[in-house]
Each structure stands twice: as structure tokens, then as C-alpha cells.
Regions:
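Extracytosolic ligand-binding ectodomains
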Residues: 2-3, 15-17, 23, 35, ...
Length: 438
């Protein structure tokens, strides 16, 4: 059964109308018995019960547009997998798309409309950490589960954590713990300059980086704060060069990374250790000739881990008609497994009740095989943040075969990259949350 994906720019009233009209048309066709295959499907519970609607929310324009597409593909693959075997609890899963934009106030409005007007069952996506914080706060008010697939501010698992939100990406603190420890060990001097994007994500990662630098015997000697629009990447790099330091810790996101590193001479990486908290495949593959320093990721399409080759083959078959992102990256991988975790929790509990699902997700553990990684993973019940393998990688440009440019240098288990402040997260009491059973 194909996923019904709706244009993200549609107003919510139209979106709800389209969902209703589409479903009524499907049921009418089944009732008329126009197709034998549809008649056979009509005998299954998924055809007679109301569909389970999940809203995929990710900014489809701006510096995260490609990330949003990759995230949606991962969610689609999981939904299609469950629908192929009859849906969930006898209900077809329908994925609808809505653009929350990169404006936090607008994102909150979109969440409110999806819940109160379109009556969706769950929200999934985000990409941008400010959007995730804004939308998940609204979801918490209504008791609607928010599955944060791919935003990586450490604050998502501490001050912006919620009982109804589960975060499936590693955060910048996890990546920077691995990267800064390595970089500081390679240099006799331990002076660090921070290059930070001036938004929730950047500031949260910079704050975590300061503590990590101090822990490993370094000192932060300066910080260059750049606007989100990154109007002058070369100017920002000149400011960094003016500071004497052995390590440069970069927390710049999305396509801004491409614009920044396009201005860097690769020889700079020999004189200094540069690290980037997280680099997604969507910032690498579109600019294969751009030099990159060390960075962190959670998965790569060419990992020699159980299940990876099969997942890549499914992806390439499913999206063979597209020119963009012919290979899946960490964003697609995270969204696929996050969506699968939600749907599996519904199957295991036999319910869509939010209280039951929260309890199930809080206790979930995954084997390394299930995660296509090197280590087992688990959902931290205190912070609702997935603890998983972190990979240290670099980019050796191969413009002729860009998919082969990424080189995995090593990996660390969850215990070695854990962000200690998550232990102090304060989630709302489950008993105080309204029940919601879509």
C-alpha cells in the first residue's frame, strides 16, 4: 500500500479535507469491488479500520531542505514496511507531510493545527532543534507523542526534554566528546577556538564543548559567533585564524557547512585540528570536492555491519528514479529506525494510548544488528534520548565517486560518549499528562 504524501505548503484545512477525501474514495472503491486485489485487501482489518495518521514535520526550504527529504524517505520506508504486512493493529499507516518552516513560532502553530484540526496521531521529524523544541512543547500540552528523528542540540535531552518526546539522533555533546578528546590528545598545545552558529543548536553545542574541553585539559581561548544566514564565511574564518589555537571546534549546521569549508585551504587542517560536531550525509554528498576535517556521524551506507547492505539495496530500489541522494545517509537511517520504533511500540502494546507507548519506548533496547551499528543501543528513560554508537569520520574527496569519499576511522560505544547532564533531565510526570489514543 503506497503512502499518501501531501504537499507541505497546503493549508491545514485543505490537508484535512484531502485526507478525508482520499480515504473516502479508497473505501468507496473497495465497497464497489472494482479491483480484485482491492477486494482481497478489503477483507483485512487495515482496510476496515480508520488509518493511523503520522505527520512528518521537517523544514522543506532553507539550509535543511535536503535533510528534510532524506528524513522523509526514512520514515516512508518504515511505513511501507509495516503496511506491506497489513498495517499496525489492522490499520493502514498514512504519512502526511507538513512544512513547519524554520520559524519557531510558526512551527508551534503548525503543531497546534495538526493536533486540533487535522487530528493526526503522532508528529515525527524536526531536523532543526529550535523547531523540535517549539513543536514538542505543544505536543506535550496535548499528550501527543513527538518523535524527534534528527535534531542534535544537547538541550533536546536536558532543558527541552519532555515526557512525550523521544530523541533518536545523537547530539553534539556525544560527537564532541569523541572528537575533542581525540583532537586534544594529538596536539601538545591545548588551546581551542569555538566557531559557533548563533542559534539554539549552536549555542547548546558550544556550551557542551566548553565543558568537554576543560575535562580533557584544554582551554577555550576564544569564540567566533556567526549568524544563521552565514553572510560572510570567509570573514568568519579570518577571525578564527587571528586567534592562536591548536584546535578549532566547529558547530555550524546544514548547508552552511558546505559554504564554510569551501573557503578553507586543506593545508589548514594539517596545522590545526579542526573538528565538526556532526556532519550529515546531506552536507557531504552534494559537495564532494569540498575539504572536511574530522567529524562525527551515527551511520554510513558502506559500514560492514549486519543489515546495512540490505537496507541500502532497499533504499536504492525504492528511490532509483531520483538523482538526489542515490545512497542513504545517517539522516535516512535515523528516521527509518525512529519510525520503526514508534510503530513497533504500538504493535507490542496493542494500543495507541500515549501512556502505554511512553512506557514501552522508555524501556526499549535494540541489538547492534537491529541498529545496523557496532553496539547495542537503548532509550534513556530519564532523558528520552537514544544512546548509540558514535563514529569518527573524515572526507577524502573523490569527485568521480563521491559516495566513496567518506572514511570511517573508528567508533565508540554509548557509554564512552554519554552526555552527563542528561541525567538531570526533568520530565513531566506521566500521571499528569492527558491520555491521547489516536
Amino acid at each position: 500500500m503506497r503512502i499518501r504524501s501531501f504537499a507541505p505548503q497546503l493549508p491545514l484545512v485543505k490537508l484535512a479535507a484531502i485526507v478525508k477525501k482520499t480515504l473516502l474514495r479508497s473505501w468507496a472503491l473497495l465497497g464497489m469491488g472494482l479491483f480484485a486485489a482491492c477486494a482481497a485487501w478489503a477483507q483485512t482489518p487495515a482496510a476496515t479500520k480508520a488509518p493511523l495518521v503520522i505527520a512528518h514535520v521537517a523544514p522543506t526550504s532553507g539550509r535543511f531542505a535536503l535533510h528534510a527529504e532524506a528524513d522523509r524517505r526514512g520514515a516512508e520506508m518504515a511505513v511501507e514496511e509495516f503496511n506491506a504486512r497489513g498495517g499496525v493493529l489492522g490499520r493502514e499507516v498514512v504519512l502526511v507531510a507538513r512544512d513547519p518552516t524554520l520559524d519557531k513560532a510558526r512551527a508551534a502553530q503548525v503543531a497546534q493545527q495538526l493536533i486540533t484540526e487535522s487530528k493526526v496521531g503522532f508528529l515525527l521529524g524536526a531536523i532543526d532543534s529550535g523547531v523540535a523544541a517549539s513543536m514538542s512543547a505543544v505536543c506535550q500540552q496535548y499528550g501527543v507523542l513527538f518523535i524527534n528523528t534528527n535534531s542534535s542540540a544537547p538541550s533536546e535531552a536536558v532543558e527541552n526534554a519532555h515526557r512525550s518526546k523521544f530523541s533518536f539522533d545523537a547530539n553534539g555533546a556525544n560527537f564532541n566528546r569523541a572528537l575533542l578528546q581525540y583532537a586534544l590528545a594529538q596536539r601538545p598545545g591545548k588551546r581551542v577556538v569555538l566557531l559557533t552558529e548563533d542559534n539554539d543548536w549552536g549555542r547548546s553545542n558550544a556550551a557542551a564543548s566548553r565543558a568537554i574541553v576543560a575535562e580533557y585539559g584544554g582551554s577555550v581561548v576564544g569564540e567566533v559567533m556567526v549568524p544563521v544566514a552565514l553572510p560572510d564565511p570567509a570573514g568568519a574564518l579570518r577571525q578564527v585564524a587571528a586567534m592562536a589555537a591548536e584546535v578549532v571546534a566547529v558547530n555550524v549546521s546544514g548547508s552552511n557547512q558546505i559554504r564554510l569549508f569551501a573557503h578553507i585551504d586543506p593545508a589548514v587542517f594539517e596545522a590545526q585540528s579542526w573538528v565538526v560536531g556532526e556532519v550529515d550525509w546531506e552536507e557531504l554528498y552534494p559537495a564532494p570536492g569540498t575539504p572536511r576535517p574530522l567529524y562525527g556521524t551515527t551511520w554510513a551506507w558502506n559500514l560492514d555491519t549486519p543489515g546495512t547492505a540490505q537496507f541500502v539495496a532497499r533504499y536504492r530500489e525504492r528511490y532509483r528514479h531520483t538523482q538526489r541522494l542515490p545512497y542513504p545517509g545517517d539522516v535516512t537511517h535515523a528516521a527509518y529506525l525512529a519510525t520503526k520504533a514508534l510503530l513497533s511500540a504500538i504493535e507490542r502494546t496493542g494500543s495507541t494510548d500515549n501512556h502505554a507507548l511512553i512506557r514501552a519506548l522508555e524501556g526499549m533496547r535494540w541489538s547492534a544488528r537491529e541498529r545496523m551499528q557496532h553496539d547495542d543501543a537503548f532509550m534513556d528513560p530519564v532523558s528520552h534520548h537514544l544512546q548509540q554508537t558514535i563514529y569518527i569520520a573524515t572526507w577524502k574527496p573523490r569527485p568521480d565517486r563521491p559516495e566513496l569519499s567518506q572514511v570511517i576511522l573508528g567508533h565508540l560505544p554509548p557509554a564512552q560518549v554519554r552526555y552527563a547532564p542528561e541525567g538531570g533531565a526533568r520530565l513531566e510526570p506521566l500521571a499528569a499528562m492527558p491520555h491521547y489514543a489516536p
